């Protein structure tokens, strides 16, 4: 299930609108300079000089960062000063080229301000020092979020992969066999192909009670599936269990399914309650959305996705009339409709192919003489 269909509030991955806006800004500035009537060579000279100043300032900033990283060269860079240098200043060839280009621009291009080269370098160093001390060039939250998403540095990314690799990938392949074993013992309690899945609840507010009946009294625990055991990380016969719940409507059972919360959301909630984690409520909501997005993207590319269904919801956004049991019933009915549609399309395709695959048959009349095509001769 793609993340865009999980819940309307889950954000899409960031695109390239910032670069498009930069292109519009570039065009606007070029048009403004053209209207001002400045000579093209004069504009180009100042542009190159300004870019050289910015790059030289970034080199100064990188050197200040290098002073801190040298303290951690053994713990962070395995004792390699070269790796610490590259981490702060990037490619050394690029740094050398930019430094030579900056020196060339300041030496050979006309200096309209009349300042010596040493003065310009000192002013650049002064400005970068003030930027670092006063944090004048701190990254905006949107920039930090973009960097974390593009580099997969978010807490939610690690939690989603851990949840899939350490849990879902282990239990989902054998889930239908365990449900079949359970049905043999309990007179087919879990009926219908649509319910032979693991329904995973994903509340975006990370409210994960240990008892589902606390979240909604119309969700009633029924039984446990047969246990599954596996050797994991030195633990012999680690046991995995799943629970079957009955969904009630007007006091009567109307559905049965294997149901549970995604436990990493409970971790996010606990982090937001612990001041040592430095995790605000807004950050928790953002990470919960990214967790659902990442988990949906992971499951979209693996065969185990056919054995589970994600139910994403947000109580506050849905209003006070929101009912978790009704939300689960909606997904159960939708799952059945999808499977009926797929089954109907498959059967019609089989019928068509079987009809077309038949050998052609000759229809031979029992009359001695052939009949004309016209009917007015009789």
UniProtKB/Swiss-Prot annotation:
User: How is this protein positioned relative to the membrane?
Assistant: Multi-pass membrane protein
Q: Which GO terms of the molecular function aspect are on file?
A: 2',3'-cyclic GMP-AMP binding; cyclic-di-GMP binding; proton channel activity; signaling adaptor activity
- The answer on whether this UniProt entry bears the keyword Phosphoprotein reads yes
For 3',3'-c-di-GMP, which residues are the binding ones?
162, 167, 238-241, 263
Q: Name one Pfam family in it.
A: STING_LBD
GO biological process annotations for this chain's record? autophagosome assembly; cGAS/STING signaling pathway; defense response to virus; innate immune response; positive regulation of macroautophagy; positive regulation of type I interferon production; reticulophagy
Which positions does the record annotate as the modified residue Phosphoserine?
Answer: 354, 365
Alphabetical list of InterPro entries matching this protein: STING (IPR029158), STING_C_chordates (IPR047191), STING_C_sf (IPR038623), STING_LBD (IPR055432), STING_TM (IPR055434)
Q: What is its main location?
A: endoplasmic reticulum
Positions with a binding annotation for 2',3'-cUAMP? 167, 238, 263
Span of the annotated motif pLxIS motif = 362-365
Q: Which GO terms describe its cellular component?
A: autophagosome membrane; cytoplasmic vesicle; endoplasmic reticulum membrane; endoplasmic reticulum-Golgi intermediate compartment membrane; Golgi membrane; mitochondrial outer membrane; perinuclear region of cytoplasm; plasma membrane
State the PANTHER family in the record: STIMULATOR OF INTERFERON GENES PROTEIN
Role of this protein = Facilitator of innate immune signaling that acts as a sensor of cytosolic DNA from bacteria and viruses and promotes low production of type I interferon (IFN-alpha and IFN-beta). Compared to other mammals, STING1-dependent type I interferon induction is strongly reduced in bats, suggesting that the cGAS-STING pathway promotes a limited inflammatory response. Innate immune response is triggered in response to non-CpG double-stranded DNA from viruses and bacteria delivered to the cytoplasm.
Describe the subunit structure: Homodimer; forms a homodimer in absence of cyclic nucleotide (c-di-GMP or cGAMP). Homotetramer; in presence of cyclic nucleotide (c-di-GMP or cGAMP), forms tetramers and higher-order oligomers through side-by-side packing. Interacts (when phosphorylated) with IRF3; following activation and phosphorylation on the pLxIS motif by TBK1, recruits IRF3. Interacts with TBK1; when homodimer, leading to subsequent production of IFN-beta.
> What is the name of this protein?
Stimulator of interferon genes protein
Species: Rhinolophus ferrumequinum
Gene (name only): STING1
């Amino acid at each position: 299930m793609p993340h865009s269909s999980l819940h309307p509030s889950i954000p899409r991955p960031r695109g390239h609108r910032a670069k498009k806006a930069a292109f519009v800004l570039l065009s606007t500035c070029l048009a403004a300079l053209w209207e001002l009537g400045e000579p093209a060579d004069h504009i180009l000279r100042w542009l190159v000089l300004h870019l050289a100043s910015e790059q030289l300032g970034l080199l100064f900033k990188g050197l200040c960062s290098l002073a801190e990283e040298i303290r951690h060269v053994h713990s962070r860079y395995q004792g390699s000063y070269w790796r610490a240098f590259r981490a702060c200043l990037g490619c050394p060839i690029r740094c050398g080229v930019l430094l030579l280009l900056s020196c060339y621009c300041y030496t050979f291009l006309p200096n309209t301000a009349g300042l010596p080269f040493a003065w310009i370098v000192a002013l650049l160093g002064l400005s970068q020092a003030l930027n670092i001390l006063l944090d004048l060039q701190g990254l905006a939250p949107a920039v930090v979020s973009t960097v974390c998403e593009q580099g997969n540095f978010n807490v939610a990314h690690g939690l989603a992969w851990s949840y899939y690799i350490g849990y879902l990938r282990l239990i989902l392949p054998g889930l239908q066999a365990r449900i079949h074993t359970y049905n043999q013992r309990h007179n087919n309690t879990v009926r219908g192909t649509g319910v032979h899945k693991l329904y995973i609840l994903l509340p975006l507010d990370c409210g994960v009670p240990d008892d589902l009946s606390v979240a909604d009294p119309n969700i009633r625990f029924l039984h446990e599936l047969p246990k599954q055991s596996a050797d994991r990380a030195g633990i012999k016969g680690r046991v995995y269990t799943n629970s079957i719940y009955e969904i009630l409507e007007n006091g009567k059972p109307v559905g049965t399914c294997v149901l549970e919360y995604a436990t990493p959301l409970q971790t996010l909630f606990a982090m937001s309650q612990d001041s040592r984690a430095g995790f605000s409520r807004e950050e928790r909501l953002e990470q919960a959305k990214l967790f659902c997005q990442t988990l949906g993207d992971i499951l979209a590319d693996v065969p185990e996705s056919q054995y589970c269904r994600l139910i994403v919801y947000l109580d506050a956004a849905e209003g006070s009339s929101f009912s978790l049991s009704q939300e689960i019933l909606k997904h159960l009915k939708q799952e059945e409709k999808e499977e009926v549609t797929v089954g109907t399309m498959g059967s019609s395709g089989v019928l068509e192919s079987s009809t077309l695959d038949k050998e052609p048959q000759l229809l031979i009349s029992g009359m001695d003489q052939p009949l004309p095509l016209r009917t007015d001769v009789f």
